[in-house]
Amino acid sequence: MPGGGPAMDDYMETLKDEEEALWDNVECNRHMLSRYINPAKLTPYLRQCKVIDEQDEDEVLNAPMLPSKINRAGRLLDILHTKGQRGYVVFLESLEFYYPELYKLVTGKEPTRRFSTIVVEEGHEGLTHFLMNEVIKLQQQVKAKDLQRCELLAKSRQLEDEKKQLSLIRVELLTFQERYYKMKEERDSYNDELVKVKDDNYNLAMRYAQLSEEKNMAVMRSRDLQLEIDQLKHRLNKMEEECKLERNQSLKLKNDIENRPRKEQVLELERENEMLKTKIQELQSIIQAGKRSLPDSDKAILDILEHDRKEALEDRQELVNKIYNLQEEVRQAEELRDKYLEEKEDLELKCSTLGKDCEMYKHRMNTVMLQLEEVERERDQAFHSRDEAQTQYSQCLIEKDKYRKQIRELEEKNDEMRIEMVRREACIVNLESKLRRLSKDNGSLDQSLPRHLPATIISQNLGDTSPRTNGQEADDSSTSEESPEDSKYFLPYHPPRRRMNLKGIQLQRAKSPISMKQASEFQALMRTVKGHEEDFTDGSPSSSRSLPVTSSFSKMQPHRSRSSIMSITAEPPGNDSIVRRCKEDAPHRSTVEEDNDSCGFDALDLDDENHERYSFGPPSIHSSSSSHQSEGLDAYDLEQVNLMLRKFSLERPFRPSVTSGGHVRGTGPLVQHTTLNGDGLITQLTLLGGNARGSFIHSVKPGSLAERAGLREGHQLLLLEGCIRGERQSVPLDACTKEEARWTIQRCSGLITLHYKVNHEGYRKLLKEMEDGLITSGDSFYIRLNLNISSQLDACSMSLKCDDVVHVLDTMYQDRHEWLCARVDPFTDQDLDTGTIPSYSRAQQLLLVKLQRLVHRGNREEADSAHHTLRSLRNTLQPEEMLSTSDPRVSPRLSRASFFFGQLLQFVSRSENKYKRMNSNERVRIISGSPLGSLSRSSLDATKLLTEKHEELDPENELSRNLTLIPYSLVRAFHCERRRPVLFTPTMLAKTLVQKLLNSGGAMEFTICKSDIVTRDEFLRKQKTETIIYSREKNPNTFECIVPANIEAVAAKNKHCLLEAGIGCVRDLIKCKVYPIVLLIRVSEKNIKRFRKLLPRPETEEEFLRVCRLKEKELEALPCLYATVEAEMWSSVEELLRVLKDKIVEEQRKTIWVDEDQL
C-alpha cells in the first residue's frame, strides 16, 4: 500500500494531537493537582492497572531528588504523560475514585465511580476472586485486632484500677500538701504581720524619740526665753529706780539754784566789800601817819590798841580756824550724808528688785507646779489608757488564738472528711470495677469472634480509649467507666503525652498558614465525617494513622483530618498495598525536612501538613508540660497559650537593614530582570554575601530553570517579586542578610521576577576578602541582647549577658542556623573574642522558654504569689466555658486561653513579680516593638493588607500588637567628643546628688543647666516649636523649662550637665543628637537605710522601694544603655559620690549604642 504510509502518519499525528489535547487539560490544572494529590494513594491503583511498574513507583516515592510531596506528584504526572492516552484514562479513574473534586475540576463531569480499566485487565471473575481473598484477609486481621483489643481492654481496666488507687494516694498527698502550703502561707502572713508590727513599733519609737527631743528642745528654749524675760524685767526695774533717783537729785539741784543769791545782791556785796577794803586801807594809812606824829602817850595808847588789835586778830583767827574746821566737819558730814543717802537708795533699789524677783519666782514656781500637776494627770490618764489597750489587746489575742484553734480543728476535720469521702469513692470505684469484671467473666465472651462483642462494651471502649497507633498512645484521660462523681472529687490527671497529640487545634482559627478557602473546605469535609461518625467503624489497617472517632473529632489537625477522610472508602486491592500504605502514612524524612531540622528558623515556617510533626523550639519548652498541669489548668488551655506565645515570633528572619525598600535602588541599564518558576529555586543555586556586601549568586545548577533563565555566578540579586508563603510580596535582596535571602528564595512559589545586575568586581572582591580571612560572609551589623545566653545551656559557643553588644559577622555560619558574632570592646568598638549564638528565631524560643519558666514554675517556695495568681486566673476563667459557639470563628477554649494569656502578660509585666522571680541567669528585657523589626516602609505596606483581613477574625490580634518577643535589638554606634549630660534614677535622689556633687569639689567638671523662665503663652508656643526636656510651673503664669540648647551650652564649656529630670526625656535628647549618661543607683532591702540622708522628704521604705523598682522597670524601654551603681559598691554618701564620678568618667569614654527602633 503505497498510500498507507502517509495516512498512517496522519492517523498517528491525530492520536498524538488528541493525547496532547487531553494532557494539556491536565497541565492546565497541574498546580492544583500537584498540590493536593498524594502519590502514595494513587500508585497502588496505577500499578493494579499496569500503567506504571515497581521501578516507577519506587522513583516517585523514594527518589532523593524529590524532597516534597509536590515534586513527587509532578514526577508522577510526567510518568503518566509518557504512557499516552491509557495513562490519561487510568489517571482520571484514580482521580474519580480518590479525589472526586479534582476529577470534576479536570473533566468538568460528575464522578460515576465506574472503573472499566481494572475490569478489562482482570476480568469480572478475577476481580471478584481477588476481592474475596482480600476480604478474607481483612476479616482475619479484624479478628486479630479484636483479640488484641480485648486483651488491651482487660489490661486497661487493670491499669485503671491501679490508676484509681494512685489517684487516691495522689489526692491524699495533694490534700496534705495543700494543708502544708496553707499553714506555710499562714506562717508567712503572720511573719509578715510581725515584721510589719515591728517596723511600725520601730517607727513609732523613732517618732516618739523625735517628739521627745523636740519637746526637750522647746522646754529649754522656753526656759532661756523666760530667763531673758526676767533679766529684762530686772533691768527695767533698775532703770526705773535710777530714773527716780536722778529725778530726786535734779529737784534738789534745782532748789539750790533757785535759792542762791541774785546777781545784783552779789554785786552789791562785792561793792560793799571794796568799800570796806578802802576804808581799812585809809584807816591803816591814817594809823601809820599818826604813829609818826603822835606823842609818846598816844603812842603808848596806840601800842596798847595795836596789841589789843593783834590779840583780837588772833582771837578772830582762832575763831576763823574754828569756823573753818566746823565747816570742814559740816562738809564731811554732808558727804557722809550724801553717801549714806546713795547707799540707802541703792539698798532700796536692791530691796525692791529682790522683792519683785521674789514675786516673779514665786509666780514661776506656781506655774511649774500647775504644769507638773497637769503632766501627772496626763500621765495617769495615759497609764490608764495603756492598761486598757493592753487588756483589750490581750483579750483580742486570746480570742484570735481561740478562733484560730477552732478554724484549724475545723480544717482538720474537713480534710479528714474529704479524705474519708475520697476513700469511700475509691472503694465504690473499685467495687464497680470488680462488678464489671465479674459481669464480664459471667458474660462468656467468645474470644474467637470478637466482632460479636456486646454493643455496650464496644461503645464503651471505642468511645473513650484508642489503641496504640503509629507508636503513639492516644489520650485516655477519661473513660466511660468513671462515674459523674469521679470528676467531682478526683482532680484531673493528665499523663505525659507527646507533642503531636497536644499540638494546636488550628482549624477554627482563621489566621493560619493555609488559605481561607482550604480552611472552609476542611471544615466542610470534617462536618461530613462528623455526620457519619456514629455509623462508621474503621477496621482497615490503613486507618491506623487517623485519630479515634470521638466527640472531639472536629478538633483534629487538618492534615490528620484529611488522612482520615481519605481512608473512609476501601482501597483498591494491590500487591503489598496495605503495607506500602502504612509506610507512606508513617512520618518520613526528606532532604528538605533534614534541612529544616538543621535550620531552626525553618521549623517556624512548616505548613500545616508538617507543622505538627516537629517540636517547636528547644526540648525545655515541651518538657514543661507536666509542671503546667500542677497549676490546675488543663493541657488544652496550656497548649493554646503555647500556640499564642508562638504567634509572637517573627515569621521571617531578622532584617537589620533600615534603608531597604521595595524598589530597585540601582535603576539603570545595568539592572536586569527575569521571570522563572520559584518552586525549588533554592535547590538550583547557592548564595553568597549579606546585608553589608549584597547577595550574590555563587553557583547555578547546570541545566536547571535558573540557568535557562539567565542567572549566572557573580550576579547580584536586587529584588524579588512574587508569591512568598501565599502572599504577593516584593522583597529587596540587596540589603538582606544571608539568612533572610535564603529564607525568601526558599519560601517563594509560582512565577517570580528576579531583578539583578552583573557585578563581577564586587563578587571577586567579596571572594578575595573571604579567602584572606578578613570576613566570613557579607553580613555585618551590631545587636544588643535582651536575654542571657549560656554556652552550656543554649547550644552555642559564646556566653553573653543581657544588654551586651555584639558584632554579627555571619547569619548562617557553616550553613547552620547559628550566628557568628564577636564581642565588642565598649571603649574602642573593636571585635574581641568570637563565637556562635542562637539565631533570631531560636533566641525567640529561648526567650519564650524563660517566660514559660516564669509563669509555670513548679517550685512553689519561689513563686507562691504566682501560684495564687494562676489559681485566681483559673477560677476567673471558668465562666468562659459557657460562651456561645454559634460563630464558627469563635472558640470558647481559645477565648479562655486568650483571656488567660492577657492576664498572664499583666502578671509578668509587674515589676514586683519580676524582681522576685528573675535570677541572674533568667534576666530578660521585654520591650515593645514592631514584629518585623526594622522592616522598611514598603514591606510594612505589603503586609498591611493581610493584617487588616485577619484583624477581626484573629482573637489574639490585639494581644499580638501589644507585645513582641524581641531577643536581639539592632543598635547603631555613636561617638560623642563633648561631655555628656547626666541623668540619675531614681529621680527623687537627683536633686540631693546634684547638690552634693557640686559641693564636693566637682564644680570644675559638673554644673547645673540654666533654665529659661517663660510665660504661659511662650511656654505653649515653645512646646509646639521646640523639644522641651524638662519643665516646671513656678507660679500660675510662669514656667521654668530646659531645652536642648541649654544643655549644649553647658557641653560647650566642657562640663557635664547634671539634670534633675526623669528618664522619660532620654528619647527626646537622643532625637536632638544629645546622648545622656543614665546612672541607676540600685536600691534593695539591704541598703535602703543608707538613702535616708539623700531623700528630700521622709518616706516609708516600702513606698521608696516600690517607686525605685518601677523606675528600674522603665529603664528597659530606653533606646540606649545605662550604667548601674550596685549596692555593694558604696557604704556611705562620700563613697557613693566617688563611685558616681568614676562611673561618669567611664561612661564618657564608652561608645554610645542606640536602638533607633525604640525612638
UniProtKB/Swiss-Prot annotation:
GO terms for cellular component: CBM complex; cytoplasm; immunological synapse; membrane raft; plasma membrane. Maintained in an autoinhibited state via homodimerization in which the CARD domain forms an extensive interaction with the adjacent linker and coiled-coil regions. Activation downstream of T-cell receptor (TCR) by phosphorylation by PRKCB and PRKCQ triggers CARD11 homooligomerization and BCL10 recruitment, followed by activation of NF-kappa-B. GO terms for molecular function: CARD domain binding. Disruption phenotype: Impaired activation of NF-kappa-B downstream of T-cell receptor (TCR), leading to defects in interleukin-2 (IL2) production. It is found in: Cytoplasm; Membrane raft. Phosphorylation at Ser-564, Ser-649 and Ser-657 by PRKCB and PRKCQ leads to a shift from an inactive to an active form that activates the NF-kappa-B signaling. Changing residue 41 to A: Slightly decreased interaction with BCL10. Homodimer; disulfide-linked. Homomultimer; polymerizes following activation, forming a nucleating helical template that seeds BCL10-filament formation via a CARD-CARD interaction. Interacts (via CARD domain) with BCL10 (via CARD domain); interaction takes place following CARD11 activation and polymerization, leading to the formation of a filamentous CBM complex assembly. Component of a CBM complex (CARD11-BCL10-MALT1) complex involved in NF-kappa-B activation. Found in a membrane raft complex, at least composed of BCL10, CARD11, DPP4 and IKBKB. The linker region, also named autoinhibitory interface, is less inhibitory on its own than that of CARD9. The linker region together with the inhibitory domain (ID) are required to prevent constitutive activation and maintain CARD11 in an autoinhibitory state. Disruption of the inhibitory domain (ID) region triggers polymerization and activation, leading to formation of BCL10-nucleating filaments. This is Caspase recruitment domain-containing protein 11. It comes from Mus musculus (Mouse).
